[in-house]
Protein backbone atom coordinates (compact mmCIF):
# COMPACT_ATOMS: atom_id res chain seq x y z
CA UNK A 1 0.00 0.00 0.00
CA UNK A 2 1.29 3.45 -0.92
CA UNK A 3 1.98 5.64 2.09
CA UNK A 4 0.85 9.22 1.51
CA UNK A 5 1.97 12.41 3.19
CA UNK A 6 -1.53 12.89 4.63
CA UNK A 7 -1.33 9.47 6.32
CA UNK A 8 2.02 10.35 7.85
CA UNK A 9 0.63 13.69 9.02
CA UNK A 10 -2.44 12.03 10.55
CA UNK A 11 -0.33 9.51 12.46
CA UNK A 12 2.00 12.25 13.65
CA UNK A 13 -0.96 14.27 14.97
CA UNK A 14 -2.29 11.17 16.73
CA UNK A 15 0.98 10.20 18.42
CA UNK A 16 3.32 13.19 18.40
CA UNK A 17 6.08 10.97 16.95
CA UNK A 18 8.56 12.26 14.37
CA UNK A 19 7.71 12.29 10.66
CA UNK A 20 10.30 9.63 9.77
CA UNK A 21 9.16 7.39 12.63
CA UNK A 22 5.54 7.71 11.47
CA UNK A 23 6.47 6.89 7.88
CA UNK A 24 8.45 3.85 9.01
CA UNK A 25 5.56 2.66 11.20
CA UNK A 26 3.10 2.93 8.32
CA UNK A 27 5.44 1.10 5.97
CA UNK A 28 5.96 -1.67 8.52
CA UNK A 29 2.20 -2.09 9.01
CA UNK A 30 1.14 -1.68 5.38
CA UNK A 31 -0.73 1.55 6.13
CA UNK A 32 -2.84 0.18 9.00
CA UNK A 33 -3.23 3.23 11.26
CA UNK A 34 -4.09 1.31 14.44
CA UNK A 35 -1.25 -1.13 13.89
CA UNK A 36 1.09 1.79 13.20
CA UNK A 37 0.15 3.37 16.53
CA UNK A 38 0.91 0.08 18.29
CA UNK A 39 4.20 -0.19 16.37
CA UNK A 40 5.22 3.27 17.55
CA UNK A 41 4.25 2.40 21.11
CA UNK A 42 6.43 -0.72 21.10
CA UNK A 43 9.22 1.12 19.33
CA UNK A 44 8.95 3.84 21.96
CA UNK A 45 9.40 1.25 24.69
CA UNK A 46 12.59 0.05 23.01
CA UNK A 47 13.88 3.61 22.68
CA UNK A 48 13.04 4.34 26.31
CA UNK A 49 14.98 1.27 27.42
CA UNK A 50 18.01 2.43 25.43
CA UNK A 51 17.80 5.83 27.14
CA UNK A 52 17.32 4.36 30.64
CA UNK A 53 21.02 4.63 31.50
CA UNK A 54 21.20 8.32 30.62
CA UNK A 55 21.12 11.02 33.29
CA UNK A 56 18.03 13.24 33.47
CA UNK A 57 19.45 16.22 35.35
CA UNK A 58 17.19 19.02 34.13
CA UNK A 59 13.45 19.30 34.50
CA UNK A 60 10.57 21.31 35.85
CA UNK A 61 8.29 21.53 38.88
CA UNK A 62 4.56 22.07 38.54
CA UNK A 63 1.82 22.39 41.16
CA UNK A 64 -1.97 22.11 41.21
CA UNK A 65 -4.83 22.68 43.64
CA UNK A 66 -7.90 20.46 43.98
CA UNK A 67 -11.30 21.81 42.92
CA UNK A 68 -12.34 22.33 46.55
CA UNK A 69 -9.15 24.29 47.25
CA UNK A 70 -8.12 22.04 50.14
CA UNK A 71 -5.39 19.84 48.65
CA UNK A 72 -2.24 20.79 46.76
CA UNK A 73 0.16 18.59 44.82
CA UNK A 74 3.60 19.46 43.46
CA UNK A 75 5.66 17.28 41.15
CA UNK A 76 9.16 17.29 39.67
CA UNK A 77 9.75 15.58 36.33
CA UNK A 78 13.27 15.47 34.91
CA UNK A 79 14.60 15.63 31.37
CA UNK A 80 18.14 15.50 30.02
CA UNK A 81 18.39 19.09 28.79
CA UNK A 82 17.15 22.52 29.74
CA UNK A 83 15.84 22.91 26.18
CA UNK A 84 13.31 20.11 26.68
CA UNK A 85 12.48 21.30 30.21
CA UNK A 86 11.21 24.54 28.66
CA UNK A 87 9.33 22.78 25.84
CA UNK A 88 5.56 23.30 25.96
CA UNK A 89 4.87 19.66 25.08
CA UNK A 90 6.96 18.54 28.04
CA UNK A 91 5.55 21.06 30.54
CA UNK A 92 1.98 20.26 29.48
CA UNK A 93 2.71 16.58 30.06
CA UNK A 94 4.11 17.34 33.53
CA UNK A 95 0.97 19.31 34.41
CA UNK A 96 -1.24 16.43 33.23
CA UNK A 97 0.71 13.88 35.28
CA UNK A 98 0.51 16.15 38.32
CA UNK A 99 -3.26 16.37 37.86
CA UNK A 100 -3.38 12.56 37.87
CA UNK A 101 -1.28 12.49 41.04
CA UNK A 102 -3.55 15.07 42.67
CA UNK A 103 -6.66 13.03 41.84
CA UNK A 104 -5.12 9.81 43.20
CA UNK A 105 -5.01 8.76 46.85
CA UNK A 106 -1.20 8.70 46.82
CA UNK A 107 0.69 10.99 49.20
CA UNK A 108 4.00 11.22 47.38
CA UNK A 109 7.67 10.90 48.13
CA UNK A 110 11.07 10.73 46.46
CA UNK A 111 12.16 7.58 44.63
CA UNK A 112 9.84 5.53 46.82
CA UNK A 113 6.88 3.22 46.54
CA UNK A 114 4.52 6.08 45.68
CA UNK A 115 6.54 6.85 42.54
CA UNK A 116 6.00 3.28 41.35
CA UNK A 117 2.35 3.53 42.34
CA UNK A 118 1.99 6.79 40.40
CA UNK A 119 3.43 5.13 37.29
CA UNK A 120 0.56 2.63 37.50
CA UNK A 121 -2.17 5.30 37.78
CA UNK A 122 -4.62 5.33 34.82
CA UNK A 123 -3.70 8.08 32.38
CA UNK A 124 -5.31 8.93 29.04
CA UNK A 125 -6.47 5.38 28.36
CA UNK A 126 -3.26 3.75 29.53
CA UNK A 127 -1.00 4.41 32.54
CA UNK A 128 1.38 7.17 33.57
CA UNK A 129 4.27 4.80 32.84
CA UNK A 130 2.99 4.15 29.31
CA UNK A 131 2.67 7.88 28.71
CA UNK A 132 6.18 8.47 30.08
CA UNK A 133 7.56 5.88 27.67
CA UNK A 134 5.72 7.44 24.73
CA UNK A 135 6.91 10.95 25.62
CA UNK A 136 10.48 9.68 25.97
CA UNK A 137 10.27 8.33 22.42
CA UNK A 138 8.52 11.41 21.05
CA UNK A 139 10.75 14.01 22.70
CA UNK A 140 13.92 11.97 22.29
CA UNK A 141 15.26 12.31 25.83
CA UNK A 142 15.08 10.25 28.99
CA UNK A 143 12.21 11.53 31.15
CA UNK A 144 11.70 10.50 34.76
CA UNK A 145 9.41 11.40 37.64
CA UNK A 146 11.73 12.25 40.51
CA UNK A 147 9.23 13.08 43.25
CA UNK A 148 5.84 14.47 44.10
CA UNK A 149 4.26 15.62 47.36
CA UNK A 150 0.82 16.53 48.66
CA UNK A 151 -0.46 18.69 51.51
CA UNK A 152 -4.05 19.13 52.67
CA UNK A 153 -6.00 21.34 55.06
CA UNK A 154 -8.91 23.74 55.12
CA UNK A 155 -7.10 25.76 52.47
CA UNK A 156 -4.11 25.07 50.21
CA UNK A 157 -2.03 27.20 47.85
CA UNK A 158 0.88 26.71 45.48
CA UNK A 159 3.70 28.86 44.15
CA UNK A 160 6.06 28.18 41.25
CA UNK A 161 9.28 30.20 41.04
CA UNK A 162 11.90 30.61 38.35
CA UNK A 163 9.86 29.10 35.55
CA UNK A 164 9.54 25.83 37.42
CA UNK A 165 12.93 25.59 39.10
CA UNK A 166 11.24 25.74 42.52
CA UNK A 167 7.74 24.60 43.47
CA UNK A 168 6.07 25.19 46.84
CA UNK A 169 2.76 24.00 48.28
CA UNK A 170 1.37 25.08 51.65
CA UNK A 171 -1.81 24.05 53.47
CA UNK A 172 -3.39 25.42 56.63
CA UNK A 173 -6.32 24.80 58.92
CA UNK A 174 -8.66 27.61 59.95
CA UNK A 175 -10.07 30.30 57.73
CA UNK A 176 -10.29 29.59 54.00
CA UNK A 177 -11.22 33.02 52.69
CA UNK A 178 -9.23 35.31 50.38
CA UNK A 179 -7.26 36.75 53.31
CA UNK A 180 -6.10 33.28 54.32
CA UNK A 181 -5.13 32.44 50.75
CA UNK A 182 -3.19 35.68 50.42
CA UNK A 183 -1.35 35.02 53.68
CA UNK A 184 -0.50 31.47 52.61
CA UNK A 185 0.67 32.63 49.19
CA UNK A 186 3.03 35.09 50.87
CA UNK A 187 4.32 32.26 53.06
CA UNK A 188 4.82 30.06 49.99
CA UNK A 189 6.88 32.82 48.36
CA UNK A 190 9.04 33.08 51.48
CA UNK A 191 9.49 29.31 51.56
CA UNK A 192 10.64 29.45 47.93
CA UNK A 193 13.12 32.23 48.69
CA UNK A 194 14.46 31.17 52.10
CA UNK A 195 13.86 27.39 52.26
CA UNK A 196 13.13 27.44 56.03
CA UNK A 197 13.67 24.26 58.01
CA UNK A 198 11.02 25.00 60.64
CA UNK A 199 7.53 26.48 60.73
CA UNK A 200 7.91 28.22 64.11
CA UNK A 201 10.48 28.81 66.84
CA UNK A 202 8.73 26.21 68.98
CA UNK A 203 9.77 23.53 66.49
CA UNK A 204 13.48 24.22 67.09
CA UNK A 205 15.25 22.31 69.85
CA UNK A 206 17.15 24.30 72.50
CA UNK A 207 20.43 22.77 71.30
CA UNK A 208 19.81 23.72 67.68
CA UNK A 209 18.69 27.21 68.69
CA UNK A 210 21.89 27.76 70.70
CA UNK A 211 23.98 26.56 67.77
CA UNK A 212 22.20 28.89 65.34
CA UNK A 213 22.67 31.82 67.71
CA UNK A 214 26.38 31.07 68.08
CA UNK A 215 26.84 30.90 64.30
CA UNK A 216 24.98 34.19 63.83
CA UNK A 217 26.99 36.01 66.50
CA UNK A 218 30.34 34.67 65.27
CA UNK A 219 29.51 35.74 61.72
CA UNK A 220 28.55 39.23 62.91
CA UNK A 221 31.81 39.57 64.87
CA UNK A 222 33.76 39.30 61.61
CA UNK A 223 32.55 42.82 60.85
CA UNK A 224 34.93 45.40 62.43
CA UNK A 225 31.96 47.70 63.06
CA UNK A 226 30.09 44.99 64.94
CA UNK A 227 28.74 45.46 68.46
CA UNK A 228 30.38 43.58 71.36
CA UNK A 229 29.41 39.92 71.69
CA UNK A 230 27.33 40.33 74.92
CA UNK A 231 25.19 43.01 73.27
CA UNK A 232 24.75 40.92 70.13
CA UNK A 233 23.58 37.98 72.24
CA UNK A 234 21.00 40.16 73.99
CA UNK A 235 19.70 41.52 70.68
CA UNK A 236 19.37 38.03 69.24
CA UNK A 237 17.62 36.78 72.39
CA UNK A 238 15.10 39.59 72.03
CA UNK A 239 14.56 38.82 68.35
CA UNK A 240 14.14 35.10 69.04
CA UNK A 241 11.50 35.76 71.69
CA UNK A 242 9.50 38.15 69.53
CA UNK A 243 6.66 37.04 67.27
CA UNK A 244 6.46 37.72 63.55
CA UNK A 245 2.75 36.92 63.72
CA UNK A 246 0.06 39.16 65.13
CA UNK A 247 -2.81 37.73 67.20
CA UNK A 248 -5.00 38.21 64.14
CA UNK A 249 -2.59 36.18 62.00
CA UNK A 250 -2.43 33.38 64.55
CA UNK A 251 -6.21 33.16 64.79
CA UNK A 252 -6.52 33.12 61.01
CA UNK A 253 -4.53 30.03 60.10
CA UNK A 254 -2.58 27.14 61.54
CA UNK A 255 0.07 26.18 59.00
CA UNK A 256 0.58 22.57 58.04
CA UNK A 257 3.98 21.35 56.87
CA UNK A 258 4.99 23.35 53.77
CA UNK A 259 6.63 21.44 50.92
CA UNK A 260 9.35 22.89 48.71
CA UNK A 261 10.80 21.12 45.68
CA UNK A 262 13.93 22.68 44.23
CA UNK A 263 15.67 21.34 41.14
CA UNK A 264 19.36 20.88 41.92
Q: Residues of each region from the PLM?
A:
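N-terminal assembly/interaction segments in proteins that build large macromolecular machines
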Residues: 2-252, 256, 260
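ATP-hydrolysis module of ASCE/P-loop NTPase motor domains
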Residues: 264
Amino acid sequence: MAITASMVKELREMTGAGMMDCKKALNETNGDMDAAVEFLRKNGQAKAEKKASRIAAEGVARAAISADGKTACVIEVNSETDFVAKNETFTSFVEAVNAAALASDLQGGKDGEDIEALLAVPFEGATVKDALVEKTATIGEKLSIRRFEKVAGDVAVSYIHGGGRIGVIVAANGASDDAAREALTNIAMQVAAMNPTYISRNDISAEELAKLQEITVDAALNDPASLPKPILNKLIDKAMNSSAWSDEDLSLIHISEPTRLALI
